[in-house]
Amino acid sequence: MIASKFGIGQQVRHKLLGYLGVIIDIDPEYSLEKPTLDEITKNDTLRKSPWYHVVMEDEEGKPMHTYLAEVQLGYENILTHPEQTTLDELSESIRLQLQTPRLRN
């Protein structure tokens, strides 16, 4: 079993670029495309660690979906971001959905 450092709905920062993001899904290992044999031997450690689907905002404030390795992300300790309220709202909405049980008919 692979343990992930971050959870769905959690706000994170891109370590290199500093962008704020919200995790919307987690893959236990890289899963966008099937790697070639050469790629497997070169990047096996990176591919076998968790990868995250993260929503971030571009320079114009438009949401964008990114796929990032765990090593590219850092914790975000600040809960509110006046300059990026939509990401705060997305994070809160996801966390509430995960905490609130749904009634199914």
Curated annotation (Swiss-Prot):
It comes from the Bacteria. GO terms for molecular function: DNA binding. It is found in: Cytoplasm. Gene3D superfamilies: Hemimethylated DNA-binding domain. Its main location: cytoplasm. Involved in the degradation of certain denaturated proteins, including DnaA, during heat shock stress. HAMAP family: HspQ. Belongs to the HspQ family. This is Heat shock protein HspQ. It comes from Blochmanniella pennsylvanica (strain BPEN). The gene is hspQ.
